[in-house]
Every structure is written in structure tokens, then in C-alpha cells.
Amino acid sequence: MDNRPIGLLDSGVGGFTVVKKVIEKLPHESTVFIGDSANMPYGDKSREQIIELTRRSVKFLLQKKVKLIIFACNTATAVAMPTLQNEVEQQIIGVIQSGSLAAARTTKNKKVAVAATPVTINSHAYQKEIKFRDPDIKVMEVAAPELAPLIESQKDYDTNLAAVKRSIAPLKDQDFDTFVLGCTHYPLIQNEFVEALGDKIQIVDPADQVAQYTFNVMRRDGLFSSFDQAGKHEYYTTGDPDKFSEMGRRFLGQADLTSHQVDTRNL
């Protein structure tokens, strides 16, 4: 048994999509989530910048004495996870491996499309992971640099829908049956993706598989909490705590959710 909290990090509010699934799967566990909204988007930054920014969030979570860390950010998973896993004792769980497994299991015609930030796409992390599971699957990748910042700014449905349609335009006439939301921000506007793609396309949200994998790791390593009541949840951001809290309340349905602003630059 281990009563320490689970740590989660993201470049911004997208991590709430993973927090939600983790809370649903592990209701007795406590969590600490930090979103680095002051420095988002990560998707247009250099490898060195992404590693350093992610390292700051990891250090913050370690100060909170977490028992494992979930990189609830595809860009951080693709770029920083290999380096930072060697720097900490706690296991780090990424979203790309889980999302790739779900995509490989879902596709029937062995054609999968992935939308993500430019850095994630340029790393070809999803392509490598999906093909590792099934070399016969064709993976089509599209960079969507405008979506994560747009979601952070909390625009209306029509604005989001237009942006989604622009972003997936390069996939027109491609015969894929499965679409991966390759950025944890994207499930926040999943309805817009459903309308833009049509109801025949299966949409994969890696957060579902991340929560299941986290459960499996904790069972294997004896990390479950001994508490039988609902866990406690803390939320932090390097950006605007009011905007961060608003998105959290809306997506998690926690009417009393509050977040705290932190400065991770001097950790």
C-alpha cells in the first residue's frame, strides 16, 4: 500500500482529460496535477526547451511526494520522457504508448490517422509505436499547431469546429477508419472532431488506456492507496489560475475546484 498521490503534468489544461479518466478508474487515489499554461504551447518549442520545462514540472511533483508520474502531454512524452525517466526513481507513464495500443486494437482496415502538435508529429512517435504493435498498419500524421492554443483560449463551438476542419484537411480522401487525438487538449473539443470526421470514424482518446495502464502498474507494484474514501485532488498552474480552474470545473464537473498559481522556474 502507498498513500502518496499520483502526479500528473501537462503543458496546459489538456491534462484534465487524463485526470478525469484516472479519477474514474482509481477513485480512492489522490492526485496532484500541474499545467504549465504560462509556457504553452510546447508543440513549437525546441527539444531542449521541452525537456527543461517538463523537468521543472517533474521537480514540482516530486516536492509533492508523488508515487508515480503521468505525462498527460503527448509532446512531453515524445520528447522529454526518455531523458527524465533516467533522472527520477518514480515510474513515468506516457500517453503515446497507451494511445498507440488503443489505435492498433481499434482499426479494422489497418489505416490510422493521428493529429498532434508539430513536435509530436515530427518525432513520428505514434507511427513508431503503432507499427511496433502491427507493422501492417498505415499511419497518417497531421500537425495541428493552432488547436492547443485555441482550446486554452476557450473559444466557441463554431470557431473550434472551423479550426478542426482546417487542421484535418490534409487527410481528405484518406481511407482511415481510426483517428487518434494525439494531444491531450483535443478531447476537450471531441464533439467538434466527431462532427468534422463523421460518425463512421472511430476516435481514440489515449486517456482511457493511460488510466487502465496506470491501474495495472499500481497493482503490480503494490502502489494502491489503503484509503476507502474518495481521494483528494490538487490543481496547480504556472498560468492564470482562474482560467485553469474554470476549465477544470467544466470538464471534471467539480463545482468547487480551485487551482493555485506556482512558479517552477527556481525549483
From Swiss-Prot:
Provides the (R)-glutamate required for cell wall biosynthesis. NCBIfam families: glut_race. The lineage of its organism: Bacteria, Bacillati, Bacillota, Bacilli, Lactobacillales. It comes from Lactobacillus helveticus (strain DPC 4571). Its EC number is 5.1.1.3. Keywords: Cell shape, Cell wall biogenesis/degradation, Isomerase, Peptidoglycan synthesis. HAMAP family: Glu_racemase. It catalyses: L-glutamate = D-glutamate. Belongs to the aspartate/glutamate racemases family. The active site is at C73, C183. It comes from the Bacteria. The keyword Isomerase applies. Pathway: Cell wall biogenesis; peptidoglycan biosynthesis. Substrate binds at D10, S11, Y42, G43, N74, T75, T184, H185. GO terms for molecular function: glutamate racemase activity. One of its GO terms (biological process) is peptidoglycan biosynthetic process. This is Glutamate racemase. InterPro entries: Asp/Glu/hydantoin_racemase, Asp/Glu_race, Glu_race.
